[in-house]
Structures are given as C-alpha cells and as structure tokens.
C-alpha cells in the first residue's frame, strides 16, 4: 500500500493527491503542513464540542470543553482560510462555511459572557457553529467515506443542520424553561 500518490501538476502545486487512501488537494509541503494542523484542530473541535454539549451546563468540564472548542474552531477557520486561499477555485465554499462556523461560535461565546445563564444565544451560536463545521467536513469528505459515498451530494449540505436544528431547538427551549422555573422558584 502506498502512503502517498501524486496527481497532476498545476502551477507549483501537485493536485488531487492521495495520502493513506484519502484524496487531498495538494502534496505541496506548505499545504500539507496547514492541512495537518487543520485536521488536528478539527478533531479537537469535534471532541470538545461534543463534550460541552453533553455534560451539565455551567459545570467546570462544560466551561473547559467549551473554551477548548472555541480555540479549536478558531484554528480550524484560520487554517481553512489558508488552505482555501491556496486552492480558491476548488475550495472557496469551505472558506464560506468556515467563516459561518467561526462567526456563530464567536456570537455564542460572546453571548454567554455577556448574558445570564439560560439565555439561548449561546446555545444557538455554539450549536450552529458545530453543525456548520460538520457540514464543511461532510461536503469535503463525504464522497470519500464508506456509506456516505452512497448519499446524494445534497445530503452532505443538509444532514448536519437537519439533525442539529431540532437538537439545538430542544436545548434552547429547555434552557429557557429552566431559567423561567428558577426565576419563579418552581422546580417542577
């Protein structure tokens, strides 16, 4: 099994290369360095975002995971910007999705710092950011993934939001109700 197989040359960059069986945009060392950082930051964002979403809100673990998620999504956007700039014609849409994910995360992060617990802006911002990040991943990688390769391309664009939107809405509604109960002194 070859770990690296080059594709065609275009300008100074080798295009459509395969590394460990997965297609990458280039084998140029700078591209690969940014891609490596991008992948590690993306994995960190996926894990820490899931942790923050699943643990008790306001707990030390939620806060720590959320901060790591925000740092990771910031790095994902920064590296996506560089990677898209290197292959703008092919990857401009990934920059746009990355900008949306980073903007939503920033809105969610700032909203939580400026508003009281139970305010839904934080939940919606962070949840939308996570869904956008997964959309970018599946749009770019879905056609090369087992089982996902059988889905129509529109599914890569719509599934993360179709799954995420009801989860985000439920979490926001629950947070609103919990805040209302705590303000009135009712726990039931």
Residue ranges of model-derived segments:
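Alpha-helical membrane insertion/targeting regions
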Residues: 2-188
